[in-house]
């Protein structure tokens, strides 16, 4: 089961705050304070924090990371929690970076960053 499917199944069946709590709205489940899971369409799933899709998985195996202009410790923690294994957001000298440790370790400045074809990771 890939990460996207795992998120969907976990949040559909969750019944307590630590595992997720259904909101009663179709396609939306509260994961923890102000963090929601949302089915964008039949192929796309997003983790939404304070109204911003911070991690978005599409049906092609691509992942989009987005801080929405809110560079807080909690936003960074939520992105790291739901990003694919091997992709990490960190801060150095007040700037955000993304570290990709999957194949050849590399570090790049954080923007609204899209990872192509990470299907085998998610």
Predicted regions span which residues?
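Terminal leader/tail segments of proteins
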Residues: 1-122
């Amino acid at each position: 089961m890939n990460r996207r499917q795992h998120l969907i199944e976990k949040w559909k069946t969750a019944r307590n705050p630590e595992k997720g709590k259904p909101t009663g709205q179709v396609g939306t489940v509260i994961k923890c304070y102000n963090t929601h899971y949302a089915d964008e369409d039949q192929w796309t799933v997003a983790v939404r924090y304070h109204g911003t899709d911070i991690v978005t998985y599409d049906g092609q195996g691509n992942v989009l990371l987005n801080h929405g202009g809110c560079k807080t410790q909690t936003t960074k923690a939520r992105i790291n929690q739901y990003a694919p294994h091997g992709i990490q957001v960190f801060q150095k000298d007040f700037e955000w970076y993304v570290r990709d440790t999957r194949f050849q370790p590399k570090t790049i400045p954080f923007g609204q960053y899209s990872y192509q074809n990470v299907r085998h990771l998610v």
